[in-house]
């Protein structure tokens, strides 16, 4: 592997479960493990990687679609786990984590940067209905990748932290009209549409217009709802809005889809 940059795969992204894999020459990391341990193992196998080689799992927040398999993997393979203090408390009070050895539990506070081997990782807060949700920007040499889903909006503060990355996983959770006319209870619709909910297709595109820069080469659409979105619609909305903003979509950078049950190719950035 080249010493410059790092490799990544979006193992799964969607309302049913989320997990992101990243490796450098020194570290192999997951962000979230929101599917069963068996499924995570299968997804890693798609990119010829094994869970026993993982050094750590970084956790964004305590919702089940982000932590479902964390405890199982930690008990079986012994990797370190990182989350902020409030998220740890919420996870330990949930039914998903189970017993994890105290030596594996580590604090990664919001708004801090930690070094894992040869990569720096910055945490930043988002606006979501969890106790203290945080996402991450990965930085090595002059390369960076941003994870930004599970937020009701992107504030100026957040946009400043994540601007001009080489790659993004950005939320495109729902189409507003499909959600409004769908079968969800009104209270759930309000929650998704609120500032503590999820970014719509249009919101995700607007966020990218504000944050991408001349370094940006890849934008992945993530956390699509099975019930309230259509992959082709999400993709078209992003591409069309970026094109209308004259931002070089398809030339300077490309837009990619993700899947809730199939890993994206292991990609070097």
UniProtKB/Swiss-Prot annotation:
Its EC number is 3.1.11.-. Its cofactor is Fe(2+); Zn(2+); Mn(2+). GO terms for cellular component: plasma membrane. One of its GO terms (molecular function) is exonuclease activity. Binds 2 metal ions per subunit. The endogenous metal is unknown. It is found in: Cell membrane. Coiled coil: none annotated. It is an enzyme of class 3 (hydrolase). Keywords: Cell membrane, Exonuclease, Hydrolase, Membrane, Metal-binding, Nuclease. Signal peptide: none annotated. Pfam families: Lactamase_B_2. InterPro entries: Metallo-B-lactamas, RibonucZ/Hydroxyglut_hydro, WalJ_YycJ_ExoDNase_sf. A divalent metal cation 2 binds at residues 65-66, 150. A divalent metal cation 1 binds at residues 61, 63. It is a peripheral membrane protein. Disruption phenotype: More sensitive to some cephalosporin antibiotics, such as cefoperazone, cefotaxime, cefoxitin, and cefuroxime, but not the penicillin-like antibiotic amdinocillin. 5'->3' double-stranded DNA exonuclease. May be involved in the WalK/WalR signal transduction pathway. Required for accurate coordination of cell division with DNA replication. May play a role in cell wall metabolism. Part of a walR-walK-walJ operon. Present in about 1200 monomers per cell in cultures growing exponentially. Belongs to the metallo-beta-lactamase superfamily. This is Exodeoxyribonuclease WalJ. It comes from Streptococcus pneumoniae serotype 2 (strain D39 / NCTC 7466). The lineage of its organism: Bacteria, Bacillati, Bacillota, Bacilli, Lactobacillales.
């Amino acid at each position: 592997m080249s010493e410059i940059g790092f490799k990544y795969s979006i193992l799964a992204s969607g309302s049913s479960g989320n997990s992101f894999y990243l490796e450098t020459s020194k570290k192999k990391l997951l962000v979230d493990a929101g599917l069963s341990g068996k499924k995570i193992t299968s997804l890693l196998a798609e990119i010829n990687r094994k869970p026993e080689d993982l050094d750590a799992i970084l956790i964004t927040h305590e919702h089940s679609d982000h932590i479902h398999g964390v405890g199982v993997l930690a008990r079986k393979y012994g990797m370190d786990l990182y989350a902020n203090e409030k998220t740890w408390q919420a996870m330990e009070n949930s039914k998903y984590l189970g017993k994890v050895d105290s030596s594996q539990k580590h604090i990664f506070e919001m708004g801090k940067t930690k070094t894992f081997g040869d990569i720096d990782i910055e945490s930043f807060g988002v606006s979501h209905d969890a106790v203290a949700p945080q996402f991450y920007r990965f930085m090595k040499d002059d390369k960076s990748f941003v994870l930004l889903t599970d937020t009701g909006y992107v504030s100026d503060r957040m946009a400043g932290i994540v601007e001009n990355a080489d790659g993004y996983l950005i939320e495109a959770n729902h189409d507003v009209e499909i959600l409004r006319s769908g079968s969800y209870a009104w209270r759930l619709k309000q929650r998704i549409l609120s500032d503590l909910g999820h970014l719509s297709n249009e919101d995700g595109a607007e966020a990218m217009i504000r944050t991408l820069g001349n370094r940006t080469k890849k934008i992945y659409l993530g956390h699509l709802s099975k019930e309230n979105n259509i992959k082709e619609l999400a993709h078209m909305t992003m591409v069309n809005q970026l094109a209308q903003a004259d931002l070089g979509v398809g030339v300077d950078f490309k837009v990619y889809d993700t899947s809730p049950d199939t890993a994206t190719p292991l990609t070097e950035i």
